[in-house]
Amino acid sequence: QYKPETYVGPDKLRVLVSLDLSKPQTMKPLDRNAGLKKQYTEGGRTVPVSWIRTFEGGRVFYTNLGHNASTYWNTTVLQHYLDGLQYALGDLKADATPSAKITREEVLAPPAP
């Protein structure tokens, strides 16, 4: 069973950093991820959660959904996996034409079970 080191789960939450927001910020915080933030946020670059495409005569389905057990048993996520697998196997037709322009849409996580 997968158990990441920095996050065990909602029932055994391990706090790594706590901030006291009542104290004023006197120093600019060290941002070690500034380069990554610039790479992924400036210029409108999006990082897809899931995608399909054709490659060398075959079909490809990719998703990075799922980081804990509750995600893997969510019926919506399971249907997403099934649809993607069926597409990759050739059982489900879908338009895999690359998007010329992606419109951003906010998507909320499903409610907790």
Show the residue positions of the predicted features.
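Active-site rim elements
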Residues: 36-40, 66-74
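Catalytic beta-strand/loop cores that center a nucleophilic Ser/Cys/Thr
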Residues: 1-56
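Phosphate/oxyanion-binding loops and surfaces in catalytic or ligand/nucleic-acid-binding neighborhoods
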Residues: 22, 87, 91
